[in-house]
Design a protein with these regions (language model features):
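Pepsin/retropepsin-fold aspartyl endopeptidases
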Residues: 1-163
Length: 163
């Protein structure tokens, strides 16, 4: 009788641990979700707002770009570390562009993302987007960001979530 009671208690403890772990995983997954629904509703562009140095930064989500970019004109307000070397980018017309690179932490809710950015003068492009769509962009997050942090873009639900 005592052995059977101990076995039942052990089974209940195991089930309790499994349940707690499952709830933790669900909560973690829900906290890591980043919605871009509002920006899609307003501008039809997938944009997410992050924070660096108490400055709100709007990033366009661009899976067609490998690299991430930060606009050179905003850097004086940000906390970043310029890295040695440069990155060679191939533009739409096939032209090679040499960019400086920096490392910068960007925050979303409780998450901090340490990311490498190409520094580029994006004022002309971003001004056109601001005039046409009404959103001020500060940078672009490319596919290497999504790969590094295991984020998937779900355009049906209009969220990015950690896999």
């Amino acid at each position: 009788m005592v052995v059977e009671t101990i076995i039942i208690i052990v089974i209940w403890v195991i089930l309790l641990i499994i349940s707690i772990n499952s709830l933790y995983q669900i909560n973690k997954k829900n906290k890591s979700r980043i919605s871009f629904k509002e920006s899609m509703d307003l501008t039809e562009l997938p944009v997410i707002t992050f924070i660096n140095n108490n400055v709100k930064l709007n990033f366009l989500l661009d899976t067609g770009s490998n690299n991430s970019f930060i606009n050179k004109s905003i850097l004086n307000m940000l906390d970043y570390k310029e890295l040695n070397g440069a990155s060679n980018i191939i533009g739409f017309e096939g032209n090679k562009i040499k960019n400086s690179i920096c490392e910068m932490k960007i925050e979303y809710k409780d998450y901090i993302f340490d990311t490498t950015f190409n520094i580029a003068d994006l004022d002309a492009s971003f001004n056109v987007i601001k005039q046409e769509d009404g959103v001020q962009l500060h940078g672009i997050l490319g596919s290497l960001f999504f790969q590094k942090y295991k984020y998937v873009l779900d355009f049906q639900s209009l969220i990015a979530y950690m896999k």
